[in-house]
């Protein structure tokens, strides 16, 4: 990436997104774009489309997600799968529509089987059951991963 490339970090105030943001700044990238949830609701497809139309990012880091702890995962199962699928569909779809040079989609350790050996290896993905309490979130993340893979295979995106 060029140091002045337009880079959008979705979720730049979260745990992972803020680390990505800081790392990019430390490496001298000068054209970083970030929006808080109040400034841009990633669940709103029209707002996401408008943002991409206006900002025209060249690179996208998708670190935004609807997250919670064990209790929230148990109570709000529908919200976890629905909201994460919606965020991913909006950001990945607009990244494709705007021909971004590269999209980095972040998964989660919870996409791996519940009983995966440590350290986890990519080959064990989808080989056995997920942890039940994380299942809706994990399935949404797996769907995002497969969505990116499918765009790459069908359209040659990166």
Question: What residue spans do the PLM features occupy?
Answer:
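SDR active-site strand-loop-helix element
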Residues: 10, 35, 60-66, 103-109
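Conserved Rossmann-fold NAD(P)-dependent oxidoreductase catalytic core, especially the SDR/UDP-sugar
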Residues: 3, 89-134
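Adenosine-cofactor binding site in Rossmann-like domains, unifying the SAM/SAH pocket
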Residues: 25-50
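Short alpha-helix in the Rossmann-fold core of NAD(P)-dependent oxidoreductases
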Residues: 80-88, 99, 104, 140-141
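N-terminal Rossmann NAD(P)H-binding glycine-rich loop of SDR-like oxidoreductase domains
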Residues: 4-27
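Active-site Tyr-X1-5-Lys
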Residues: 132-158
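NAD(P)H-binding glycine-rich loop region in Rossmannoid oxidoreductase-like domains
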Residues: 45-85, 97
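Conserved mid-core alpha-helix of short-chain dehydrogenase/reductase
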Residues: 47, 86, 90-94, 147
């Amino acid at each position: 990436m060029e140091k002045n490339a337009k880079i959008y970090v979705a979720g730049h105030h979260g745990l992972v997104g803020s680390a990505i943001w800081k790392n990019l700044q430390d490496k001298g990238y000068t054209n970083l774009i970030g929006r808080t949830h109040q400034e841009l609701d990633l669940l709103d497809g029209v707002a996401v489309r408008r943002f991409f139309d206006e900002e025209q990012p060249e690179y996208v880091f998708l670190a935004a997600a609807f997250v919670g702890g064990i209790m929230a995962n148990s109570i709000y199962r529908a919200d976890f799968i629905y909201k994460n699928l919606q965020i991913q569909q909006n950001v990945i779809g607009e990244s494709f529509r705007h021909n971004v040079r590269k999209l980095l989609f972040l998964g989660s350790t919870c996409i791996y089987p519940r009983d995966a050996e440590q350290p986890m290896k990519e080959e064990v993905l989808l080989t056995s059951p997920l942890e039940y309490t994380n299942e809706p979130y994990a399935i949404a993340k797996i769907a995002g991963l497969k969505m990116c893979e499918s765009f790459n295979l069908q359209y040659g995106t990166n």
